């Protein structure tokens, strides 16, 4: 039994709604200066891709075939894993920078307290 809404499968509706919500949130974060222009572009590409792959599932298979990957789902899983590793690396860099900032701040506070 296939769940559908009109002509669309339920996952297509959910994927499209999530993609549109992601676009709205991305623009809101950009307006609040919480995302850089490059970050906005990256998120827009991601959310538009979610919408495209949701509305046209064979599209992922065509891209997979162009890249020499067997199935569209395999392609999406590979992209998801690579994206997760990229985000993990970005988080690592952010934590490392924050750790350095905290170390410098603690050092400055210690020097000020020592001088007083």
UniProtKB/Swiss-Prot annotation:
Q: Which GO terms describe its cellular component?
A: plasma membrane
Q: Which Pfam families match?
A: DUF2304
Indicate whether Transmembrane helix appears among the record's keywords: yes
Identify the InterPro entries for this entry.
Answer: DUF2304
Q: Which UniProt keywords apply?
A: Cell membrane, Membrane, Transmembrane, Transmembrane helix
The membrane-topology field of this record reads: Multi-pass membrane protein
What domain of life does the native source organism fall in? Archaea
Q: Which residues cross the membrane?
A: 8-28, 39-59, 75-95
Q: Where in the cell is it found?
A: Cell membrane
Q: What's this protein's family per the entry?
A: To M.jannaschii MJ1580.
Protein's name in the database: Uncharacterized protein MTH_137
**Species the sequence originates in:** Methanothermobacter thermautotrophicus (strain ATCC 29096 / DSM 1053 / JCM 10044 / NBRC 100330 / Delta H)
